[in-house]
Amino acid sequence: MGDCSIFTYTDNDFIGKVCCSGQQNRGRSRFDIALRSGWTEKRNTGLFRYRLDELETRILPGSRGYIAQLNIMRGTERRKPQEILSVRQNFDPKQFNFNKINPKELLFELKRESERKCSVIINVSPLEFGHCLLVPEPEKCFPQVLTHLAVQTGIETVLLSADPGFRVGFNSLGGFASVNHLHLHGYYLNHRLKIESSPAKLVLPNLNLYELVDFPSGFLFYTQGPNLDLVVKAICSLTDVLVDHNIAHNLFLTRGCPPQMEPDTSSSRNGVRVIVWPRLSCFGAKEESAFNVALCELAGHLPFKNRQDYESATEETVQDIIQKYLLPQEETAQLKEHLMKCL
């Protein structure tokens, strides 16, 4: 991928205390400064497919607090998605992959002491400020299937940020991933999401695996670091089962509250919530609609592609769209039963 700066970090760089104060000028970590300044420089030099300024945003009335944003250019200017036929589809070197990008799109290499590197590159069709792609060991050409390193890097980047608005996510093949080359998304969203504090019940104590009580139901893991090995293994054991059964899925990683049965109204966001949503697969070329149901939409962040849908959207219409992509209740029950037997 060419020469670039290397961002080296240790556990000492993790930010332990984060508070959702609602203020624009929060304290910034070394990671935030590197990402925000590098991303802004790339934007100013015209490397993006369109210029992303402040997006028109509205919070939909209702209990879910959906964050709707109008991002017409992303809907029209982004790279055409690859055709996906299976959650376990092999990497194809003939297709676009992140070894083929313009070297100027590379922000820096992320490297934990004495461990493997992860390339941090700009998403040239950004959905929000700071939108980047985390690509673990791109030269190894991993397909879009989560690995231990990918999950660990995702959690650690959230811990490296002092901004509770920094989010990380993953779309599996069949879950609206656009490129079959292992990558995660990272971006800043300066709005609180219900998912940060929504209630959850414990379903598998040996894995500290919880289930979200509210719509859309998904599996929840929680960690405050720095010892991440157990939670990373638990997450991978779940996603491995989904891949083995060809079940598409989306992940969302965000600062959040410890899981409990009652919603947490405090502003403390010291840990990381990792939510895994098994979902119906969408194979073949992507369908175009008001919005694709993927990692950020399931978390309550809705980038709309056209003004008409943006202005007419209600909590009810959004839930109806999302519901169509969730596993039916019977399949969800069968999956939970299988997980309890094999994990």
Curated annotation (Swiss-Prot):
Reactions this protein catalyses: GDP-alpha-D-glucose + phosphate = alpha-D-glucose 1-phosphate + GDP + H(+)
Disulfide-bonded cysteines: none
Predominant place of localization: cytoplasm
E.C. number(s) listed in UniProt: 2.7.7.78
GO molecular function: GDP-D-glucose phosphorylase activity; guanyl-nucleotide exchange factor activity; hydrolase activity; nucleotide binding
Active site (UniProt): 183 (tele-gmp-histidine intermediate)
Catalytic class of the enzyme: transferase
InterPro entries assigned: GDPGP (IPR026506)
TM stretches of this protein: none
Gene Ontology terms: cellular component: cytoplasm
Keyword annotations from UniProtKB, A to Z: Cytoplasm, Guanine-nucleotide releasing factor, Hydrolase, Nucleotide-binding, Nucleotidyltransferase, Transferase
Location(s), subcellular: Cytoplasm
Other facts: The orthologs in A.thaliana are GDP-L-galactose phosphorylases catalyzing the first reaction of the Smirnoff-Wheeler pathway, the major route to ascorbate biosynthesis in plants.
Similarity comment: family membership: Belongs to the GDPGP1 family.
UniProt function note: Specific and highly efficient GDP-D-glucose phosphorylase regulating the levels of GDP-D-glucose in cells.
Protein name, UniProt field: GDP-D-glucose phosphorylase 1
Organism the protein comes from: Danio rerio
